[in-house]
């Protein structure tokens, strides 16, 4: 009997870039009468598994929303724990990424991070900068509107007189990375919550009730299988699509 991963690989192309809002850590913990921080710890485990499975499938870019600009409003003890977990991941998990030829990038403002976290970010990005495997981008203290504004301000500061879509895109946090093909949100909510607003213009959206700590390889396979069944026309008619895409 074939595994779910093998079944996915026998269909059409795997999405080159997957973006994820990892929602549901707190609710996962609450259902088990555990403190919220335990949900975040299990969420980190789920991310590790997601990275491994994406690499196995052949996904080239994985971008996850870890901490938004709005998340600073959460209880102080929870924010403190999240920052500590972030630093722990930078210090320990980055070695595994590097050993597997994966690159790590951190997207977002760095103004509110302490020196220890900033140092961890710089060292992690430098260590993996030349790796050529999967690129894992973690959005931390990030917001889609903020991203567009910071890009516009950089263009103004550099005196760019004419701004095109391509020009603006290069100044966004994702830089030269391709736009996401597939967006996944766990936890049952059906909105994009200020995440990659510009870059997700043509992404296929996939929402699931599964809470993030429970999102495993099979759940990812199901999301990719759903993506592969969709007809991505980008404004064209079905008849204008390549023959290979029409067959799928």
UniProtKB/Swiss-Prot annotation:
Annotated positions binding Mg(2+): 23, 204
Cofactor note: Binds 2 magnesium ions per subunit.
GO cellular component, one term: cytosol
Entry-linked SUPFAM superfamilies: Undecaprenyl diphosphate synthase (SSF64005)
Keywords: Magnesium, Metal-binding, Transferase
Similarity annotation: Belongs to the UPP synthase family.
Function: Catalyzes the condensation of isopentenyl diphosphate (IPP) with allylic pyrophosphates generating different type of terpenoids.
Stated name of the protein: Isoprenyl transferase
Lineage, opening ranks: Bacteria, Pseudomonadati, Pseudomonadota, Betaproteobacteria, Neisseriales
């Amino acid at each position: 009997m074939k595994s779910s991963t093998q079944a996915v690989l026998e269909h059409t192309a795997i999405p080159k870039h997957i973006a994820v809002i990892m929602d549901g850590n707190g609710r996962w913990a609450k259902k088990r009468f555990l403190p919220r921080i335990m949900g975040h710890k299990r969420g980190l485990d789920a991310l590790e598994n997601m990275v491994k499975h994406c690499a196995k499938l052949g996904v080239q870019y994985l971008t996850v929303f870890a901490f938004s600009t709005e998340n600073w409003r959460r209880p102080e003890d929870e924010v403190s724990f999240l920052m500590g977990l972030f630093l722990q991941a930078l210090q320990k998990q980055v070695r595994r990424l590097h050993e597997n030829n994966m690159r790590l990038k951190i997207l977002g403002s760095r103004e509110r991070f302490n020196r220890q976290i900033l140092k961890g970010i710089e060292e992690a990005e430098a260590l993996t900068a030349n790796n050529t495997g999967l690129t894992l981008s973690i959005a931390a203290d990030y917001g889609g509107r903020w991203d567009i504004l910071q890009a516009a301000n950089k263009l103004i500061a550099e005196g760019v007189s004419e701004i095109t879509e391509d020009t603006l895109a290069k100044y966004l946090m994702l830089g030269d990375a391709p736009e996401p093909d597939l967006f996944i949100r766990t936890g049952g909510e059906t909105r994009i919550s200020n995440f990659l607003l510009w870059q997700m213009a043509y992404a296929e959206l996939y929402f699931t009730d599964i809470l993030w700590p429970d999102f495993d390889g099979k759940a990812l396979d199901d999301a990719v299988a759903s993506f592969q069944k969709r007809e991505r026309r980008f404004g064209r008619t079905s008849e204008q699509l390549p023959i290979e895409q029409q067959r799928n």
